Curated annotation (Swiss-Prot):
Cytoplasmic side: 1-21, 66-71, 98-110, 138-142
GO CC aspect terms: chloroplast envelope; chloroplast outer membrane; etioplast membrane; mitochondrion; pore complex
Main location: plastid
InterPro entries documented for this protein: OEP21
Chloroplast intermembrane face residues: 32-55, 82-87, 121-127, 153-158
One GO BP: regulation of monoatomic anion transport
The protein's name in its UniProt record: Outer envelope pore protein 21B, chloroplastic
UniProt entry keywords in alphabetical sequence: Chloroplast, Ion transport, Membrane, Plastid, Plastid outer membrane, Porin, Transmembrane, Transmembrane beta strand, Transport
Length: 167
């Protein structure tokens, strides 16, 4: 099980996130993940999703259900396509999108982004770094991510940010 501690610019409490991937076959897994709000002591959300990877097309697709304490039960579909910029795939151009559909079949929170990702292995001894720079199409905002081993910082040009530490 993967666990992390998360803190965002619009939250007053730390969140504990847990994720488990249960293999179905070599290209498909069931992904279960949820979050506990340490301020309230209650779960923030829970999600179950079937994810499939198409290696010949460098593409991933996921379909699942998401329960949120505010927006209740939703169905979601997400996809990502990766285009290598370099032959070693350390620099990629990614297109990704997500669509949530509520119980009344209304589309909620659409997301779509184009980004460049640069993976720097052994930046220093035992230190890997990933830098992402992208543009979120629906929110119309540039964003960036810097990841160093267990630490991840995400920020956008509207002043929103979040920090994650993988345990």
């Amino acid at each position: 099980m993967e666990t992390s501690m998360r803190y965002t610019s619009n939250s007053k409490s730390m969140k504990i996130h847990a994720k488990e991937k249960v293999p179905v076959n070599s290209k498909t897994h069931l992904q279960l993940h949820g979050e506990l709000d340490t301020g309230t002591g209650a779960p923030s959300y829970f999600c179950a999703m079937i994810r499939h990877f198409f290696p010949e097309a460098s593409t991933g697709l996921g379909v699942g259900l998401h329960y949120d304490k505010r927006q209740k039960l939703r169905c979601l579909v997400r996809g990502k396509k990766e285009f290598p910029v370099r032959a070693d795939k350390r620099v990629t151009f990614n297109i990704k999108g997500r669509c949530d559909i509520d119980q009344d079949l209304n589309q909620k929170n659409p997301k779509g982004a184009a980004e460049f990702a640069w993976n720097i292995m052994d930046f220093k001894e035992d230190q890997d770094v990933r830098i992402k720079v992208g543009y979120e199409m629906f929110d119309k905002v540039p964003y960036m991510q810097i990841r160093e081993n267990n630490w991840t910082l995400n920020a956008n040009m509207k002043g929103k940010w979040n920090l994650r530490y993988d345990l």
